[in-house]
UniProtKB/Swiss-Prot annotation:
It is an enzyme of class 6 (ligase). UTP binds at S14, K187, T188, K189, P190, T191, Q192, K223. The lineage of its organism: Bacteria, Pseudomonadati, Pseudomonadota, Gammaproteobacteria, Enterobacterales. It catalyses: UTP + L-glutamine + ATP + H2O = CTP + L-glutamate + ADP + phosphate + 2 H(+); L-glutamine + H2O = L-glutamate + NH4(+); UTP + NH4(+) + ATP = CTP + ADP + phosphate + 2 H(+). Pathway: Pyrimidine metabolism; CTP biosynthesis via de novo pathway; CTP from UDP: step 2/2. The active site is at C379 (nucleophile), H517, E519. ATP binds at S15, L16, G17, K18, G19, I20, D72. HAMAP family: PyrG. Keywords: ATP-binding, Glutamine amidotransferase, Ligase, Magnesium, Metal-binding, Nucleotide-binding, Pyrimidine biosynthesis. Residues 291-544 form the Glutamine amidotransferase type-1 domain. This is CTP synthase. CTPSs have evolved a hybrid strategy for distinguishing between UTP and CTP. The overlapping regions of the product feedback inhibitory and substrate sites recognize a common feature in both compounds, the triphosphate moiety. To differentiate isosteric substrate and product pyrimidine rings, an additional pocket far from the expected kinase/ligase catalytic site, specifically recognizes the cytosine and ribose portions of the product inhibitor. It comes from the Bacteria. Homotetramer.
């Protein structure tokens, strides 16, 4: 188990930024030479977010070991050095599924299965496993205190203070302190009621973090401390900011990390946040800007592409450029045409599932190829680029994916089983199963072709990148497409078989498609080489076409 546990709950409203707050505090504690990890506990009944609509829930973040998790795990990886895994993300559905599986196997010896103790014991077991080998485990409890779904998780963390010891447990409650513009004052009553709700469950928060449009004054902090039964010095303020990367600095400035260390009697050097200060400086002082269009079908909710947007921002920091991101719905392109793509310096088509909006993406890929606008296709974005090329350059006029048309004449994209019948091959491809189909998930090796653009960008012959897809480029059509000018610069090998990982078009300044998701490996302090190169190509295109 971890030496110490910090549990972070949220009150008043949802979407207060518990994940970013937890990740930021973790980053500052990590800078004090502590070994830190994080964990997300989600109250919803889905086993994982893999089948939830991105419009409802945001993106699915994929870990190295292939877990489909909440987008907050992406924030965790972007703020701390520790990589997340399947043990860092649990939902009510996953917990209940494990308990029911154990019951069927007879593990409970005929006991009546109940929320207490069976569900709560399983939750505690998962928390302890996630913290093994670390100094501090920060656990974010999803949802809002008062929600019926989160009660088993709150009961579990209450029990842990008794079983492990209060000196090793810290409860942080993140709450909203609304600012009323009419009266020009902040209101503390919602926070008082939220803490009262937490107390009714048996949890006394040790620290309160107040989210507000304005800084919470000393008087207001004293009032909150008095009525919420916490010391004045344990009430902290986090006002709205224009950059999430300022949060570690704000936390350090207010001494939250020092308060945590003092509470746990930890003696460590002061945090060195010079890297974060460098990030903020570059963000505030760009030397130029570029317009990049993300062509997708979940554009109503930017969080559907959270890691992607972040990766572009990270590459902007590296290139000292401000990235003006335009989220363009591909259905709009189908109805209005390429007029939606004017004034873009680069086009990026991300991953996705289903036929809706695909033809709009194909139009965008064609426009990018013909106008020599830098193009980056990720997962489905690579596949639509290949479909477009096969149709309009190779001459396979009915090229398509069997995901969209089962019996298409030229299935240039298909499931492996549709063009390779080797059962052993499927078993060796590190394909994980769910209730719906098979997918390649998590880290996979990719071998790069020497002399290719991809090889130059990575400066390596073998790379590891994360995948989340079930359809592949159909090898039957590869030679014909390559003969037309599209090259394959990255391959995944399984026994004597291989799968396309990266495509390039040499008759173009920058035209790259990757079957994997490089955005999951980008951080503000270490941006991904593919995105760095892509953003630079966008700036070069802008300067060339002034």
């Amino acid at each position: 188990m971890a030496k110490y546990y910090i549990f972070i709950t949220g009150g008043v409203v949802s979407s207060l930024g518990k994940g970013i707050t937890a990740a930021s505090l973790g980053s500052v504690l990590e800078s004090r030479n502590l070994k830190v990890t994080l964990m997300k506990l989600d109250p919803y009944i889905n086993v994982n977010p893999g089948t939830i609509s991105p419009i409802q829930h945001g993106e699915v973040f994929v870990t190295e070991d292939g877990a489909e998790t909440d987008l907050d795990l992406g924030h965790y990886e972007r703020f701390i050095k520790t990589k997340m895994s399947k043990k860092n993300s649990f939902t009510s559905g996953k917990i209940y599924s494990e308990v029911l599986k154990n019951e069927r196997k007879g593990f409970y010896l005929g006991s009546t299965i109940q929320v207490i103790p069976h569900i709560t014991n399983e939750i505690k077991k998962c928390i302890i496993n996630a913290g093994k080998g670390f100094d501090i485990l920060l656990v974010e409890i999803g949802g809002t205190v008062g929600d019926i779904e989160s009660l088993p998780f709150l009961e579990s963390i209450r029990q842990m203070s008794i079983e492990i010891g209060k000196n090793k447990i810290l409860y942080i409650h993140l709450t909203l302190v609304p600012y009323l513009k009419i009266s020009k004052e902040v209101k503390t009553k919602p926070t008082q009621h939220s803490v009262k709700e937490l107390l009714s469950i048996g949890i006394q928060p040790d620290i309160l973090i107040c989210r507000s449009e304005k800084n919470v004054s000393k008087y207001e902090k004293s009032k909150i401390a008095l009525f919420c039964n916490v010391p004045k010095q344990a009430v902290f303020s986090l006002k709205n900011t224009n950059s999430i990367y300022k949060i570690p600095i704000l936390i350090k400035k207010q001494g939250l990390d020092s308060y945590v260390c003092d509470r746990f009697c930890i003696k460590r050097p002061e945090a060195d946040l010079s890297k974060w200060k460098e990030v903020i400086y570059k963000q505030k002082n760009p030397l130029g800007n570029v317009n990049i269009g993300i062509i997708g079908k979940y554009t109503e909710l930017p969080d559907s592409y959270r890691s992607l947007i972040s990766a572009l921002e990270h590459a902007g920091l590296k290139n000292r450029l401000m990235i003006n991101i335009q989220l363009i719905n591909s259905k709009k392109i189908e109805s209005l045409g390429i007029s939606c793509l004017k004034n873009l310096h680069a086009i990026l088509i991300p991953g996705g599932f289903g036929y809706r909006g695909v033809e709009g993406k194909i139009i965008a890929a064609k426009y990018s190829r013909e106008k020599k606008i830098p193009y980056f296709g990720i997962c489905l974005g690579m596949q639509v680029a290949l479909i477009e090329f096969a149709r309009n350059v190779t001459g396979l006029s009915e090229a398509n994916s069997t995901e969209f048309i089962n019996n298409c004449k030229h299935p240039v994209i298909a499931k492996i089983s549709e063009w390779n019948k080797s059962i052993n091959y499927l078993n060796k491809s590190n394909i994980s199963s769910n209730n719906y189909s098979t997918m390649r998930l998590g880290n996979q090796k990719c071998h790069l072709t020497k002399g290719s653009l991809a090889f130059k960008i990575y400066n390596n012959s073998i790379i590891l990148e994360r995948h989340r897809h079930r359809y592949e480029v159909n090898n039957i059509f590869i030679e014909k497409i390559k003969f037309s000018g599209l090259s394959v610069s990255g391959w995944a090998y399984y026994d004597n078989h291989k799968l396309v990982e990266i495509i390039e078009y040499s008759n173009h300044p920058w035209f790259v498609g990757s079957q994997f998701h490089p955005e999951f490996n980008s951080t503000p302090r270490n941006s991904h080489p593919l995105f760095i190169s892509f953003v630079k190509a966008a700036f070069d295109f802008k300067n060339k076409n002034i």
